Structures are given as C-alpha cells and as structure tokens.
Amino acid sequence: MQPTMRIIVSMALLAYAVASAYHSNVKLRRDGKMVLYPFPRVGRASGNTWQLPLNDLYPEYEPAQVKRQLYAFPRVGRDPVMSRLGRSDLSRVESHEFQPMAVRRTESPGMWFGPRLGRAFKNDDDEITIQNESNDHSEPEQTELIHEDRRKRQTLN
C-alpha cells in the first residue's frame, strides 16, 4: 500500500475506535447537571433542628440508609433574622404579624410596571397616520377579528 493510503486507513480506524469508546463508555459525561444530587434536600429552619432523632421519624429504616438518602442543606439566601429564629418563634411568623400590608389603589392612571405598560387611557399621539398613501403598500391589519362560520368536515364512517 502507498503511505498516504496507510495514513488514511489508520486515521479512519482510529476515529472509529475513539467514537465507539466514546459512545459505549459506562462513565457518564460531566456537564453542568452532574454535580447535583438526585436526593431530597432537607432544609433546617434553625440550629436547634439540626440534630433530629432519625429513629423516631423513620422507625422502619436503618439509620445508615436514611442518612444516605437525605442531605441537610442550610437555607441559603434567606433573611438572617428568620434563620436565627427558634422553633418556638416560628408560630409567631405564621401569625398575622408578618403578613404583607394591603396595597392602596389610586385612581390615577400612572405607570405600573414601567413605561408603556399598563396604560389605562389612549393618547391622541397614539393614532397611526399613513403619510404616503399609494397602491404599492398593503392594507393595515384589522384590529377586530371577523368571526366566520366554519363547516364541519365530512368524514367517512
């Protein structure tokens, strides 16, 4: 065989071997989701609840089996005042002390989410005027939908 043909055949065999090893590999590829645990996360409200007696909660399981399935994660991004509350203070949080206040509605048509969103009235500036009326432009779209009666398609039984 010629040297160029040998190189081409060896490159093809090498590519085939790499591709078959890549597809049949038992080890999973690492991507952004591989570092997440597929187990339920158990968050703790305060430091008093970190040491829970697992035997009382799960009497039918062995403790080693329960510990393998549940991961305790701290509450990241929570309010620091709420994270320092004990279990006795949680009843106060559930009461009406921490409920949000009712928002007063005003009658003025002000901006709600930002400019040009939530406007309650129409300005004279909003009218669309066609400056160059010629035949080469298409008609503007209709704003009201025209309801047409549709006939049922005949089907063979």
Swiss-Prot record:
The modification Pyrrolidone carboxylic acid is found at Q69. GO terms for cellular component: extracellular region. InterPro entries: Pyrokinin_CS. The modification Leucine amide is found at L85, L117. The modification Valine amide is found at V42, V76. One of its GO terms (molecular function) is neuropeptide hormone activity. It comes from the Eukaryota. Its main location: secreted. This is CAPA peptides. It is found in: Secreted. Belongs to the pyrokinin family. CAPA-periviscerokinin 1: Expressed in corpora cardiaca (CC), corpora allata (CA), antennal lobe (AL) and gnathal ganglion (GNG) (at protein level). Expression detected in most animals in CC and CA and in some animals in AL and GNG (at protein level). CAPA-periviscerokinin 2: Expressed in corpora cardiaca (CC), corpora allata (CA), antennal lobe (AL) and gnathal ganglion (GNG) (at protein level). For non-pyroglutamate form, expression in AL detected in all animals, in CC, CA and GNG in most animals (at protein level). Residues 134-151 have a biased composition (Basic and acidic residues). Residues 131-157 are annotated as: Disordered. Residues 1-21 form the signal peptide. It comes from Agrotis ipsilon (Black cutworm moth). Keywords: Amidation, Cleavage on pair of basic residues, Neuropeptide, Pyrrolidone carboxylic acid, Secreted, Signal. The keyword Secreted applies. Residues 22-28, 45-66, 120-157 form a propeptide. One of its GO terms (biological process) is neuropeptide signaling pathway. The keyword Nucleotidyltransferase does not apply. Transmembrane segments: none annotated.
